Amino acid sequence: MSGHSKWATIKHKKGALDAKRGKIFTRLIKEITISARAGGDPDGNPRLRTAIAAAKAENMPQDNIKRAIQRGTGELPGAVYEEITFEGYGPGGVAVIVEATTDNRNRAVSEIRHAFSKNGGNLGEPNSVRFMFQKKGLIVVSKDAADEEKLMNIVLEAGGDDLNGEGENWEILTEPQAYDAVVQAVRDAGIEPQVAEVTMIASTYTKLEGATANQMMRLLETLEDHDDVQNVYSNFDMEQVEEVAG
């Protein structure tokens, strides 16, 4: 199983947990609000366009999307959010990147540091683990939706990098700047992705066993549960995640 497939596995699990906890709307609204700072017109703001597409995929009401955009542009009052990226290590030397959006920087720093230390990890300095990851666009589509040759032609013509078959799915990788064009080309061909977002993909993965693996899972869950956390990335072997999670 490839590295990015392992990433997709945990993201699917994470998405299901988020939905259960009723947190996904909050995270999406924050992303729309932050994105809209660069302009409220999605046609001229790729990040906002991606955020709106993600919200619509989760059936967020249009009114919620509109209000989030207006808070970002300043048309409506609202919390002033700051984006913070944390880097650190989990149990067994697993590299972890946490992306947070908060209206209270000091609180967020304190609580994220505590989450690491309580679960066998430690918060690191900026760029301490970033070099272990690559920022990539990831688009996952069902093999039932398109054959390899057709999809490969779509991907390459739109500027994508790679197409891999993983189980029942095709996984498309792009550079971040090409992501928007590739995902649009896929949708224009009548293919709806199961996953479509810009993410961080680890270059290598770390396997853990037993109590250390369980502790790493607790760290990931604690971070993902935090109200300010938008995304958590790690190079914890995702096959191990499946085994530990059962």
UniProtKB/Swiss-Prot annotation:
GO terms for molecular function: DNA binding. The keyword Transcription regulation applies. Keywords: Cytoplasm, DNA-binding, Transcription, Transcription regulation. The keyword Transcription regulation applies. GO terms for biological process: regulation of DNA-templated transcription. GO terms for cellular component: cytosol. It comes from the Bacteria. It is found in: Cytoplasm. NCBIfam families: PRK00110.1, PRK12378.1, YebC/PmpR family DNA-binding transcriptional regulator. Belongs to the TACO1 family. This is Probable transcriptional regulatory protein ACP_0521. The lineage of its organism: Bacteria, Pseudomonadati, Acidobacteriota, Terriglobia, Terriglobales.
